[in-house]
Amino acid sequence: GTCLDSIEDFKQLIGDFPVDRGFYNLAFEGVASQVLFAMYIAAAEELGFSRSKLRGSAGADPIGSRLGFKVEVFPVEAELKLSADVLEFCVKNMPRWSAVGVGGFNCRGGGIDAVDEVGISLAAAIAYIEGGLERGLHVDECAPAISFFMASGIDFLEEVAKLRAARRMWARTL
């Protein structure tokens, strides 16, 4: 990992990279992901990059963090509100950014099976979209701002079937 405590740290980290031409996964967990995401945006803008052209994912999955890593910083309602804040901000200002990276792999690491991983991931994604809908956003605006990070175990055929089923279930849900 990398220790990032300030906007200056981010500027030093990304200073030589064309951050507007790649996809950057900011793999931070819990509430820290939103704070570090804001620092990343500020650093990129100070380096002359437009936030609307940045592409990547910010993690920001408090449900996955709670279930997979047992990280509970604030009450769940406050964490869901913060995730909805990030989702709304990204929909309005950063259309190429995945506001919430639903971490099914976090839960899988906690001991659940592939079926439960899909169920928990879809339920979490629905909760995040509902947060956007409560703010007046449309599902077609929210859905592209949600990404999924799923585990891949040793049973190859089961994992392929899981991913195919998850895609179909997500499409039907939307």
PLM features: what roles do these ranges have?
Residues 1-158:
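Catalytic alpha/beta active-site cores
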Residues 163-167:
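Active-site loop/helix belt of alpha/beta enzymes
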